[in-house]
Amino acid sequence: MLLAVGAIIAGLILLVWSADKFVDGAAAAAEHWGMPTLLIGMVIIGFGTSAPELAVSAIAAMEGNSGLALGNAYGSNITNIALIVGLTAIIAPITVHSQIIRKELPLLVGLTLIAGYQLIDGELSRTDGWVLLTVFAAVMGWFIFQGLRNKDDSIEAGIEESTLAHPMPLRNAVFWLIAGLVLLVASSRMLVWGAVYVAQSLGISDLVIGLTVVAVGTSLPELASALAAVRKNEHDLILGNILGSGIFNTLAVVGLAATINPLQVDPEVLYRDWSLMLALTVGLLLMGFGFAGRSRIISRLDGGILLLVYVAYTGFLLTTMIPATG
């Protein structure tokens, strides 16, 4: 138990440090390569930091643990929006000024609806998995096309200004881009191992582990990257990170797990967990678009509401599921 606790502490410390280096490398590399920074946020930061989710769900599927595989993916999406966006907005309100992000938000809502439709029959077959992976490949191509078309997006000017203030040679940028990502994944795996060991010692079910402990652990790279980005005032990089990760989890993580081994879907996954994931995604859409006379900003009040939802959901999971395992 002491070794597991030590892994959690060491993983957290290494995670925060490596995330800061990774964001620096990503922004500098984007400037050198002439790539839109939001594209870096979507593809490298958003998808790259989702590698822990991919690994955990793939291994869980190989072992026939559908609850852990799905709980990790959907729990990470819930954590990303409710906990990470909520906490980040409380620290500093997030301004939504990128035209690209206002396209990605409705896309994520649509993909979440597709995911829910696949859950209705109580199973995610290999065919369902291949459908998700095919859609993922198409979305990736669309991301790249849109990113290259929008080189003048306002986010790029802001990131160029910040990177020019602290120029980094391309060699150093690439080094920290790769090393930072490797350390992010390694430290998150260290943390998840410790957290899962502790949770299992307490007798918590696999589904709850996936939705809470594992989801939070594998989402910590997104949290660390978001906190580093808000410190640098790179607001669209924050949302690019979260949206990219959400799309990756919904399509690639679940899709790969289902192609490895068909996943059995418990009823509560659809009616409780997926429903909350959809509600949070729609809520983020409304905040990002600024409907009903609102400014396009995720305020501290919005962040507080998201964080409260996360605390209530996690508390509900623990109070309803832990007794059932005893």
Regions found by a protein language model. Give the residues of each.
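Hydrophobic alpha-helical segments, chiefly the membrane-spanning helices
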Residues: M1-G326
